[in-house]
From Swiss-Prot:
InterPro entries: YbaB-like_sf, YbaB/EbfC. It holds the Pfam family YbaB_DNA_bd. This is Uncharacterized protein MG134 homolog. It comes from Mycoplasma pneumoniae (strain ATCC 29342 / M129 / Subtype 1) (Mycoplasmoides pneumoniae). One of its GO terms (molecular function) is DNA binding.
Length: 100
């Protein structure tokens, strides 16, 4: 395979992966935490669109537990979206025999 052909294939792969990344950033993901006690809607670019909390969790006497649950739920959602992004980028890069 010629160097020119390899270079063009790499450029095409880069364009495709950039487009996939842009599409992913605009995609919405919905996560439920603790049997939907906390629901998070998050974009692929990790911007939170909304957080919904089951009213049964709201105890004015125990604010700390709710804060901890929200923090844990957000961290899980962010981690899941990052993992999906990493998987998408891994799949987007073509396997070119003889290069690596």
């Amino acid at each position: 395979m010629s160097f020119k052909k390899i270079t063009e294939m790499m450029r095409q792969a880069e364009r495709q992966s950039k487009q996939k990344a842009l599409d992913f950033e605009q995609k919405l993901f919905e996560y439920s935490y603790k049997n939907a006690a906390i629901k998070i809607i998050i974009f692929g670019n990790l911007t939170i669109k909304s957080i919904t909390i089951d009213p049964a969790l709201i105890d004015p006497e125990d604010k700390v537990t709710l804060e901890e649950m929200i923090t844990e739920a957000v961290n899980e959602a962010v981690g899941d979206v990052k993992a999906k992004y990493d998987q998408l980028m891994e799949e987007a890069m073509p396997q070119m025999p003889g290069l690596f």
